[in-house]
Amino acid sequence: MRVLIDADGCPVVRETVRQCAAFHVPCLLFCDTAHVFSIPGVEVFVADCGHDSTDYLLLSHLRPGDVVITQDYGLAALCLARSAQALHPAGHAYTKDNIDALLTVRA
């Protein structure tokens, strides 16, 4: 298991990285060129700025069993379809039981 963070605009990057380090869980950050991170011990993947470019980069590295932190309902749905878990930065889990309703109401 690894934790992948959709880091563009994610309010809990540093906290998540700290928890991953404490439990020896690999943590990967995905961002675009407008939000570049440099955190020791964390692998950072940088996508070009563009519609959903960070999401596609994250998906290309996703493995079954990974945990993804994202505020993006669409990305969460794609992660669930690939046998990964997805969590909102506030802590609630996206599941097959709630993702359709969330996708319906997204802006």
Q: How does the language model describe each region?
A:
Residues M1-A107:
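Nuclease catalytic cores that cleave nucleic-acid phosphodiester bonds
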